[in-house]
A protein has these predicted regions:
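C-terminal accessory region of radical SAM enzymes
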Residues: 209-228, 262-302, 308
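Short Fe-S-cluster ligation motifs
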Residues: 326-360
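Local cysteine-cluster metal-coordination motifs and their immediate loop/turn environment
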Residues: 294-315, 330-337
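Acidic, low-complexity/disordered tracts enriched in E/D and polar residues
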Residues: 1-46
Length: 360
């Protein structure tokens, strides 16, 4: 029995192969492990051959080091029954018309209209919201908004707000305590950067300050620090759909509906038009299924299913037969062919696009 043992990698480990590297994503522990691409054939053989045969097929030293790595990192186990560890089903489906939305807020005499907009989004199944508030956040404003909404699908709200010298940590913490579905408040334009975690908050709630201005042009940055692991479902969605725009609606301050706040095209107005008709329109959904496997350069990147695929700002260097921009996101400095990160803004090949978007 011993010589028929197999090394199996756990089903919640998602493996992605790039041009020269591969990664093993542990979705349960939110960890990423890198390996040379040369191990990909070995990994593909694991369920087909017992370890005794694999040791003969591959270099003894490398094979034993690989087995030790998998077991030490708790990424797999030895078993005589590999059939008991089926692969994760990578098909994705969700019933809601809209899953996530971004709403812009500006100073107003009345904030009730924002609540009415949120209700329309909730009616279409929206679960996740980002409030981009171009004003200092206040309890009275949120109360005015939320009193107009009966949430049936809400899971979380993240708030981006302008800094105010009149507001202290406690002002924001009071809001987080009162509304546990608000998972984070990010204060933009702060003189200092800080990440506040208070014991009185729920485990998944955060308050943080950043110096950066609250500007749509600051969106779409790709770096190691913002490659988030959101669980198996999110990665599976990213495999089959666009990781940024799938089932997303952006509503600007005037009620105009877009795929993303940074994009120019408007598809209608949430205050004047039927929201379902807009989001169910083929033209609105045309980018929803533009996956990373179709994006130039990204298709060869090991991080492609962890990355948010920005379509608002791209290198503008590659288009498909239908005219869709399939260029790499402008603000990514990673080269999957060398495995190295570099500053994107100084790349000579990106200067034309940088000038076009007015980011000089």
């Amino acid at each position: 029995m011993k010589n028929k043992e197999f090394l199996v990698i756990y089903s919640d480990i998602i493996i992605t192969t790039g041009a020269i590297k591969m990664i093993l994503v542990d979705t349960s522990r939110n960890k990423v492990f890198e390996l040379p691409k040369s191990f990909s054939n070995l990994i593909n053989d694991l369920k087909n051959y017992p370890v005794t045969e694999l040791r003969l097929k591959y270099d003894d030293k490398n094979f034993d080091s690989f087995v030790k790595f998998i077991l030490d990192q708790d990424l797999g186990m030895m078993t005589p029954y590999p059939e008991m560890f089926p692969n994760v089903d990578q098909s994705f489906s969700s019933p809601e018309y809209i899953n996530n939305s971004i709403l812009e807020f500006y100073p107003s005499e009345s904030y009730e209209k924002y609540g009415e907009r949120i209700q329309k989004l909730d009616d279409l199944g929206c679960k996740f919201y980002e409030f981009r508030m171009h004003l200092p956040i206040e309890m009275t404003i949120l109360e005015s908004i939320f009193k107009r909404v009966v949430f049936n699908n809400l899971k979380s709200i993240n708030i981006l707000s302008l800094n105010s010298s009149k507001l202290e940590d406690e002002n924001y913490l009071i809001i987080l305590r009162k509304f546990p579905f608000i998972k984070s408040i990010c204060v933009f334009g702060s003189p200092v950067e800080a990440n506040i975690k208070e014991e009185s908050l729920m485990e998944d709630q955060r308050l943080y300050y950043i110096k950066e201005a609250l500007d749509n042009k600051n969106c779409g940055k790709v770096s190691l620090s913002n490659l988030f692991i959101r669980g198996t479902d999110q990665i599976v969605e990213n495999i089959s759909h666009n990781s940024c725009l799938h089932k997303k609606v952006a509503v600007d301050n005037d009620g105009n509906i877009k795929n993303c706040p940074s994009m120019q095209r408007c598809y209608g107005n949430i205050d004047k038009n039927d929201l379902l008709e807009i989001v169910d329109n083929t033209s609105f959904k045309k980018l929803w299924n533009l996956t990373k496997d179709k994006i130039d350069i990204c298709k060869d990147c090991e991080f492609r299913y962890l990355c948010t695929d920005c379509r608002a700002y791209t290198d503008m260097s590659k288009f498909d037969e239908q005219g869709l921009d399939i260029s790499k996101p402008l603000k990514c400095g990673y080269n999957p062919y060398s495995g190295e990160w570099a500053e994107w803004s100084t790349n000579p090949l990106k200067q034309h696009a940088i000038k076009y978007y007015g980011m000089q």
